[in-house]
């Protein structure tokens, strides 16, 4: 058996008739499948055992030879070889066709490859192949031209005139003759000559023809192989026929299609033997051609062949195409053994790295391990009895199971797996019941809740797989989110509420101003009712053993609350005592003002102070990030578990409830509504008098009601007591926000109709008061639209992720430094006056391109090629530096990937990225995963042209697909000043005066100007509001201008929705869109003008020519959308499994393409280890990870085996 890991590349080509015969084990001569009485395959039929091998292991057709001892014997009676039945999956047969037929992929594809080779139109080809016209194959001495089409009538008249002096034929035979006559060398030279002078359409056609001719010349494929003499028959197990319960048979559609071909072929043979009239033979040949077309690609030409119930039959091409095709269903989406799924329930008692596995599920999943252990413990004699024991659930089994699952991690996956945190590893603990228990903190990463979600469990079997699961995938390791490097395991809901309640302060609580010698004493006071959690007290600072306190502070008293004393117990010793939710307290030390000298009157001191705010969700996240930064993984996951327990415990003790009395009704509400109504009436009056337009009236009414709702909201929030449970839930970040509360207690406000337009009648009631029928009806629109949008958005976002993954899947960190001589200048991303992304966010975790010096002192803050840390980034920003040059994926020189230095820090681990990290996939997931959070709609604001800019998910798709944007902005191509605005006919023009020339740009009337007369503008700058067309920008500002623009725009959309994504992810994607060059002229190189080349291929071709002092090729960069870029990848396996399968394969076969298996998808398809992570060649043969001196090797044999 071939070892999959030793493949170098995979090549595809056209099969010659000899090749097809060499694959075959025999000719299929009859259309029969199996005998209906004996249910055995018919001889020479589509399932023949003599050709394809026996149906039962080691047993021939007639039963003369049975058992394995006759292995390899060919039965003298029935001719079947005695071997395993699985050869029926690999042995092929063939059909000798009585007349040549054309292969529909090469004749019918776009562009028609046969047409390009012969320089004929597809229409003419079709007429010849389907016997509607004759084609002159040899004009002889007649005035006819080669390849001239003749109708039946013309052929007759010429035949009468010239007799046998010329040859004209019909059908695929004629085409084959023409293909064989072609001299490729001569044609290629002629085409290259023609290219030098040709223009327009002729040039395009010549380029296309040259490409196909070159392909045939270089690949070793013969052009005549596009015509088939022999048809391969695929193995029978791949087109099976199975008996159903009622004695009927279910068969693959391919068998029907093959039967049609064989029937027509046999009939044609008979007609030829009988010497039938040519018209009958021609008709039969045409029918054979159509049958073969239907077999290869049913429905490509004419009406598809249908089966019972008018269903089109699935041909060979359909077996590969689409989601149900071979690629996506079986090669990229295999189902795996050792897996199970069940409903999840919360497991608050679990540790971060644990999950609860139901006993009966564990028993089934770990069956082989249990059997082995039962035998090795002597509890069963052999594997068979061990298996029986497990099936009967013998009590011994449970003890063994407990031991087997120790230290054996399992993987939990929740669909949809939107990013890599959708599969994590846990150590299983056995639980009763049939539900999987999940740790509450990992829910955010999985986006799971416990309303009936299900999860799948997978068992890593091999030692390497277990090691990877434990070291890389354990839930306790995945604390940071790969998209922005922020903690993903922040507490939510109950846990937030508990910790918020715990850290609240209250005036005049029981025992206020008490003084305790240590935490324990305070706890006893709380438990015995002498103090409350919210009581402000003093405690001896030295008793807290906090390593951040100074000597002086330790001698003082610390003012805090009982709750905060309890909260700080969960934090590590050398962490500041957290007394207030500020960055200063978190990052540096407990503020000095909380320490008082002994002897101060504590009660008076406390009463003179303001209450300190409690710790909300965001601050808890900051604490986690800070602990992670200082103490790394292990300590953080322990602290998280303690924080979770604390939260659950105190949210229970808090006993938060929501009652109707908690929803306070605003007294001034009616007044505010009346005032708004008056304003609306006034606007209506103005409209009726014709002072304002319909649009203005609508916009103003909407604005009035929105403002009224905001006023009510502000007053409501102001009137709420901060002890109100609903307020506490919303304020802490546990659930709900101000808008939800306004709907409960104030008013619901304005609603959108099904088209997304805002209805101008507001809902004045709140849920507390109850809605009128009319109001209820209006609000159903919005609710329904919400659900519909969510469903559509999920599908759209999923498809976006799929395309992103496809285009970036081969971007892997391949080396540590590419040695590039270019950097990327970064500054804060700004849109007008608003900052989209501050400079500090763009610097952290990036490598500097040159020394960064302090502008005043001149000292070096960051060395060249050094990773910029948080502190260094802070120093850079504080020193007033506005822009820094960093290494970036945009400027990286690594082939097929990025280098360590240009990528910088791996956001998911907080340390340098390692060689082998699949950063392309991480980037795609980081951009795709928040896609569901983006809005769907294009905002319509009453038809003002400039405002209808696409936002949210559609805008992201527009950017990554490099489409012409909606609401396109007009941009200037030259530097200069805005001279004037001219009015021409029905539009206006902006005139820009450059140094040398003057340009004018036509602008629609309703566009909104971004510049005024006298402004200085740069090339590529927008003159009107709207989105820039990136392709236009590429021509004006070049690659760097487009890269900057796309990065800024993608970040703008995400940041507007409050989603943070690391720049480097967007850079990786944009790099993939700009990796091709379109050749303009080929110079002395071999490359074809008009062809698309990878950047490095183009450079290599030029380098070669320059070394020989020839003329290099010229090219211009192109921006491809992600779908186009995926299909243009060098790997035909990856492209074929993405979209347009048949087109990609047709093209690859003609070119005889080699797939070098550099990306991840291609390797998954052929079943090889992916070339990323531990699958990279340089890591492949590391046994133990220990580099031992040679002398030590013998002595430590035992140790290596345990590693």
Swiss-Prot record:
Residue spans of biased composition, Acidic residues class: 1190-1203
UniProt-listed SUPFAM superfamilies: beta and beta-prime subunits of DNA dependent RNA-polymerase
Pfam families, sorted: RNA_pol_Rpb1_1, RNA_pol_Rpb1_2, RNA_pol_Rpb1_3, RNA_pol_Rpb1_4, RNA_pol_Rpb1_5
Catalytic activity: RNA(n) + a ribonucleoside 5'-triphosphate = RNA(n+1) + diphosphate
Cofactor: Mg(2+); Zn(2+)
Classification via CDD domains: RNAP_beta'_C (cd02655), RNAP_beta'_N (cd01609)
GO BP terms in the entry: DNA-templated transcription
Full protein name: DNA-directed RNA polymerase subunit beta'
Source organism of this protein record: Oceanobacillus iheyensis (strain DSM 14371 / CIP 107618 / JCM 11309 / KCTC 3954 / HTE831)
Lineage of producing organism: Bacteria, Bacillati, Bacillota, Bacilli, Bacillales
Name of the gene: rpoC
């Amino acid at each position: 058996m071939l070892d999959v890991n030793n493949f170098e590349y995979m090549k595809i080509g056209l099969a010659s008739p000899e090749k097809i015969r060499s694959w075959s084990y025999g000719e299929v001569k009859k259309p029969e499948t199996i005998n209906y009485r004996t249910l055995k395959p018919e001889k020479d039929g589509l399932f023949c055992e003599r050709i394809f091998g026996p149906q039962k292991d080691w047993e021939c057709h007639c039963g003369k030879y049975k058992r394995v001892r006759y292995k390899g014997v060919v039965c003298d009676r029935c001719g079947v070889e005695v071997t395993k039945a699985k050869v029926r999956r690999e042995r092929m047969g063939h059909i000798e066709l009585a007349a040549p037929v054309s292969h529909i992929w090469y004749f019918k594809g776009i562009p028609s490859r046969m047409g390009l080779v012969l320089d004929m139109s597809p229409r003419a080809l079709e007429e010849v192949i389907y016997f509607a016209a004759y084609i002159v194959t040899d004009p002889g001495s007649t005035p006819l031209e080669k390849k001239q089409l003749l109708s039946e009538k013309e052929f007759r008249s010429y035949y009468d005139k010239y007799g046998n002096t010329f040859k004209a034929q019909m059908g695929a035979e004629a085409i084959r003759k023409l293909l064989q006559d072609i001299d490729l060398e001569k044609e290629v030279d002629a085409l290259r000559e023609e290219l030098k002078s040709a223009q327009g359409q002729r040039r395009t056609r010549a380029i296309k023809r040259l490409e196909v001719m070159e392909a045939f010349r270089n690949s070793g494929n013969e052009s005549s192989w596009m015509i088939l003499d022999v048809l391969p028959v695929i193995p029978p197990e791949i087109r099976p026929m199975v008996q159903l319960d009622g004695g009927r048979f279910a068969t693959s559609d391919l068998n029907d299609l093959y039967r049609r071909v064989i029937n027509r072929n046999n009939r044609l043979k008979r007609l030829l033997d009988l010497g039938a009239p040519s018209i009958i033979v021609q008709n039969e040949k045409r029918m054979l051609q159509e049958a073969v077309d239907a077999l290869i690609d049913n429905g490509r030409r004419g009406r598809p062949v249908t089966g019972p119930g008018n269903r089109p039959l699935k041909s060979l091409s359909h077996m590969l195409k689409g989601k149900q095709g071979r690629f996506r269903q079986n090669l990229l989406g295999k189902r795996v053994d050792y897996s199970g799924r069940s409903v999840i329930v919360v497991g608050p008692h679990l540790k971060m790295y644990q999950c609860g596995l139901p006993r009966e599920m564990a028993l089934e999943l770990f069956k082989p391990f249990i059997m082995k252990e039962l035998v090795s413990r002597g509890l069963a004699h052999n594997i068979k009895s061990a298996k029986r024991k497990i099936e009967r659930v013998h009590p011994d089994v449970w003890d063994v199971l407990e031991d087997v699952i120790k230290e054996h991690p399992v993987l939990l996956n929740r669909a949809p797996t939107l990013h890599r945190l959708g599969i994590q590893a846990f150590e299983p603990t056995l639980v009763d019941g049939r539900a999987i228990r999940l740790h509450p903190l990992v829910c955010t990463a999985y986006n799971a809740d416990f309303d009936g979600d299900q999860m799948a469990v997978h068992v890593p079997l091999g030692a390497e797989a277990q090691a990877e699961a434990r070291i890389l995938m354990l839930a306790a390791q995945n604390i940071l989110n790969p998209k922005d490097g922020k903690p993903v395991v922040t507490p939510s809901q109950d846990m937030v509420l508990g910790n918020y309640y715990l850290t609240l302060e209250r005036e005049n609580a029981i025992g206020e101003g008490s003084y305790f010698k240590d935490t324990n004493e305070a706890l006893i006071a709380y438990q015995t009712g002498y103090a409350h959690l919210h009581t402000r007290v003093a405690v001896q600072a030295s008793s807290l053993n906090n390593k951040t306190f100074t000597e002086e502070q330790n001698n003082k008293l610390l003012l805090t609350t009982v709750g905060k004393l309890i909260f700080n117990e969960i934090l590590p010793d050398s962490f500041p005592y957290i007394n207030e939710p500020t960055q200063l307290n978190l990052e540096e030390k407990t503020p000095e003002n909380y320490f008082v000298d002994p002897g101060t009157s504590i009660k008076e001191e406390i009463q003179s102070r303001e209450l300190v705010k409690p710790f909300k969700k965001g601050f808890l996240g900051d604490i986690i990030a800070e602990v992670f930064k200082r103490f790394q993984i292990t300590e953080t996951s322990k602290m998280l578990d303690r924080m979770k327990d604390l939260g659950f415990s105190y949210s229970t003790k808090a006993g938060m409830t929501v009652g109707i009395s908690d929803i306070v009704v605003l007294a001034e509400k009616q007044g505010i509504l009346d005032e708004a109504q008056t304003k609306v009436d006034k606007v209506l009056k103005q409209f009726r008098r014709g002072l304002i337009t319909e649009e203005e009236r609508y916009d103003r009414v909407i604005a009035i009601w929105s403002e009224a709702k905001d006023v009510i909201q502000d007053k409501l929030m102001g009137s709420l007591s901060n002890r109100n449970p609903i307020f506490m839930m919303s304020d802490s970040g546990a659930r709900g926000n101000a808008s939800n509360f306004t709907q409960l207690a104030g008013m619901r406000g304005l609603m959108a109709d099904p088209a997304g337009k805002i209805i101008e009648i507001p809902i004045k009631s709140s849920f507390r008061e109850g809605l009128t029928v009319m109001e209820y009806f209006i609000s159903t629109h919005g609710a329904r639209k919400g659900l519909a949008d969510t469903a559509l958005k999920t599908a759209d976002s999923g498809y976006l992720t799929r395309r992103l993954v496809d285009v970036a899947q081969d971007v892997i960190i391949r080396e540590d430094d590419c040695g590039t001589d270019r950097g990327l200048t970064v500054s804060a991303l700004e849109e007008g006056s608003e900052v989209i992304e501050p400079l500090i966010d763009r610097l952290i975790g990036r490598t500097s391109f040159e020394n960064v010096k302090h502008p005043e002192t001149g000292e070096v803050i960051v060395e060249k090629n050094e990773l910029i840390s948080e502190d260094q980034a802070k120093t850079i920003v504080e020193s007033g530096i506005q822009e820094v040059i960093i290494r970036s994926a945009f400027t990286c020189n690594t082939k097929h990937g990025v280098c360590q230095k240009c990528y910088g820090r791996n956001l998911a681990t907080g340390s340098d990225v390692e060689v082998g990290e699949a950063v392309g996939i991480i980037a795609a997931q980081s951009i795709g995963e928040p896609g569901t959070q983006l809005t769907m709609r294009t905002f319509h604001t009453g038809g003002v042209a400039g405002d209808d800019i696409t936002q949210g998910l559609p805008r992201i798709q527009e950017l990554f697909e490099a489409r012409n944007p909606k609401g396109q902005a007009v941009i200037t191509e030259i530097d200069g000043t805005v001279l004037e605005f001219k009015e021409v006919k029905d539009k206006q023009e902006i005139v820009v005066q450059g140094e040398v020339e003057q340009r004018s740009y036509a602008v629609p009337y309703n566009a909104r100007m971004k510049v005024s007369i006298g402004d200085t503008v740069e090339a590529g700058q927008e003159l009107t509001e709207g989105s820039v067309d990136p392709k236009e920008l590429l021509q004006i500002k070049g690659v760097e201008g487009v890269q900057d623009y796309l990065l800024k725009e993608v970040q703008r959309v995400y940041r507007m929705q409050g989603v943070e994504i690391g720049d480097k992810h967007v850079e990786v994607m944009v790099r993939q869109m700009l990796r091709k060059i379109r050749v303009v002229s080929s110079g002395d190189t071999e490359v074809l003008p008009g062809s698309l080349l990878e950047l490095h291929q183009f450079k290599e071709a030029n380098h070669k020519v320059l070394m020989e002092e020839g003329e290099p090729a010229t090219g211009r960069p192109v921006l491809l959308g992600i779908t186009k870029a995926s299909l243009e990848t060098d790997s035909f396996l990856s492209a074929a499994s993405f979209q347009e399968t048949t087109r990609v394969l047709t093209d690859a076969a003609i070119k005889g393409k080699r797939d070098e298996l550099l990306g991840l998808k291609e390797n998954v398809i052929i079943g090889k280890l992916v070339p990323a992570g531990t699958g990279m060649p340089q890591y492949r043969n590391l046994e133990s990870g220990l580099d031992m001196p040679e002398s030590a090797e013998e002595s430590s044999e035992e140790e290596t085996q345990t590693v």
